[in-house]
Amino acid sequence: MNQILLRVLAVVLSGVSPEPLDEKVVPFNEMPVECAAVYDADIRQFRQATATEVITSDLDGDKIPELLIFNGENGSGGVGWAVLQKANGKYRKVGDVFGILYKSGYGLIVESPCGWAEATWSYYTIEHGKLVCKFEITVKYSKPIRQEVVSIKIKVKNESGFTK
């Protein structure tokens, strides 16, 4: 985990985003029912959506890709994603994230911008069938779009919660 923490810190300090995950548009009728169900039904009806974005990525290092499915939620800080893991031939939702997603080997880096002067970077993995945030880095900037870092706050998750 230290290597990933250092990698995310390098991104934060350099202002250069890591490589985004590849999205693929998949029609709802071509995905398993449990996967299509994560897209908010009211939003789906309002938008008359017939498909959604899907990302495949190994989040736990078992060489079996999990599915990240756009759930219909979006805003200035990114979009909502449901994370599903395959077990016994079916997909099961293990968690949700909101933000901009990036590659990290295995695991998931999520950037959540908040206005022009702040952003939170989080690293997630799957443990015991649940999506777990292992650390968060909150950064305040003096200039917009990730320039001139003013402060960095790092919270690392341990057994009892986050520590500073």
Language model features: what each stretch is:
Residues 64, 71-76, 86, 91:
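Mature extracytoplasmic domains of secretory-pathway proteins
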Residues 70, 94-96, 134-136:
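Residue-level detector of high-confidence beta-strand sites
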Residues 49-54, 78-79:
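Short coil/loop residues immediately preceding or within conserved phosphate-binding loops
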Residues 3-10, 14-45, 103-164:
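Acidic, small-residue rich beta-repeat scaffolds with periodic aromatic anchors
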Residues 76-82, 117-122:
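Structural motif
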Residues 61-72, 105-112:
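Acidic/hydrophobic-patterned starts of short beta strands in beta-sheet-rich repeat architectures
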